[in-house]
């Protein structure tokens, strides 16, 4: 049972409400309408053996998030965001035979409903989930059984919701260094790793479409190769065949990594404290052009499912410069950028508005792009 949250009771809603509506948009129209999105990060995807698995709340708050409330979700909409990505570790509290715990499923369902009621598009995925993805190369049969079991249950649980709910095949785990190392692997190894990624994504599409109902026409988000821009734009990466023709591709954008990820110097790079040189802008434009030319120009919409910055040791104005630049370059090419956010970095989950230091960030990220 979930504790500490009185707003968990029930997931039944008015069947006439917009959350059950199929709008009939193309996936590109849907992605364009999203505008800018934000992640409900470090919440339902939290995991770890040290977390008491007796209640969903222990996982929901295990990585620092407060218990999610309807007001918290409505706050995203009030701040101008058009989409909410909900990362989930479905293995938490999982029962035998890969059965999702009913309490965990019910709690995520409540939050998804709150988002749909707020007129947010919702992206629902399987996240890192304690890393069981790493076993695909050596235990493909069991991993695929778990993968299909999870999505079969999710298709059933969320199948009645309208097409503002999007399913995402997986997070950024599609790619295995145990098969192919991008720096030293062979072409044969590379082909093998890409083939496995393509197989998982095709399995996902086939399963969702076969479940029928609204899932037959639901917009689907297909994970790129480790969601890396260059590797996803490689000819070996294939979008799955989809009878509905409603798939978009997902990449993540943390480039340059020395700026976006590092707090301090590491053995692989020196921490970059400022962004904005002509070279920085050129790199961003080159990557966005590559995505546009490879996918958007050929009718495949692009969602940048995560982009963000490690804010430690950086000036807020410079962080905003980078984030707004990514947003602008993405939106100018009809792509939807989804900000990676965890508790109280950019959005305050207790006051339901942007934190003071980034109080104008939402305006930058949701401003119209000419």
Q: Which sequence ranges carry the predicted segments?
A:
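Active-site region of glycoside hydrolase catalytic domains
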Residues: 144-280, 289-310, 332-335
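Acidic/histidine-rich helix-loop elements
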Residues: 41-68, 96-100, 139, 258-284
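C-terminal motif of bacterial Sec signal peptides marking the signal peptidase cleavage site
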Residues: 2-6
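Aromatic-rich peripheral "rim/lid" segments of glycoside hydrolase catalytic domains that contact
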Residues: 314-370
């Amino acid at each position: 049972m979930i504790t500490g949250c009185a707003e968990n009771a029930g997931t039944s809603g008015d069947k006439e409400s917009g959350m059950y509506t199929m709008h009939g948009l193309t996936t590109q129209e849907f992605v364009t309408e999203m505008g800018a999105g934000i992640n409900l990060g470090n919440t339902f995807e939290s995991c770890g053996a040290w977390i008491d698995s007796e209640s969903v709340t222990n996982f929901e708050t295990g990585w620092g998030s407060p218990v999610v409330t309807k007001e918290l979700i409505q706050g995203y909409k009030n701040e101008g965001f058009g989409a909410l990505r909900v990362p989930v570790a479905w293995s938490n509290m999982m029962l035998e035979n890969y059965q999702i715990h009913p309490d965990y499923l019910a709690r995520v369902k409540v939050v998804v409903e709150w988002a749909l009621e707020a007129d947010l598009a919702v992206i629902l995925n399987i996240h890192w989930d304690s890393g069981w993805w790493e076993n695909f190369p050596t235990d493909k049969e069991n991993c695929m059984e778990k993968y299909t079991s999870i999505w079969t249950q999710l298709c059933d649980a969320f199948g009645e919701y309208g097409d503002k709910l999007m399913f995402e095949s997986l997070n950024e785990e599609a790619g295995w260094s145990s098969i192919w190392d991008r720096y030293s692997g062979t072409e044969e190894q590379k082909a093998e790793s890409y083939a496995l990624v393509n197989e998982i994504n095709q399995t996902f599409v086939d399963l969702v479409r076969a479940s029928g109902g609204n899932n037959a026409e639901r917009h689907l988000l297909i994970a790129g190769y480790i969601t890396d821009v260059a590797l996803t734009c490689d000819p070996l990466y294939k979008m799955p065949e989809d009878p509905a023709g409603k798939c978009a591709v997902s990449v993540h954008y943390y480039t340059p990594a020395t700026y976006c990820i590092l707090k301090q110097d590491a053995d692989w790079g020196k921490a970059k404290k400022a962004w904005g040189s002509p070279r920085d802008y050129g790199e961003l434009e080159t990557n966005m052009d590559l995505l546009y030319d490879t996918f958007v120009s050929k009718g495949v919409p692009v969602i940048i499912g995560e982009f963000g910055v490690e804010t430690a040791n950086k000036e807020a104005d410079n962080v905003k410069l980078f984030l707004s630049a990514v947003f602008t370059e993405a939106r100018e090419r009809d792509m939807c950028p989804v900000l990676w956010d965890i508790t109280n970095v950019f959005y305050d989950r207790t006051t339901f508005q942007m934190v003071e230091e980034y109080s104008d960030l939402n305006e930058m990220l949701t401003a119209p792009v000419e």
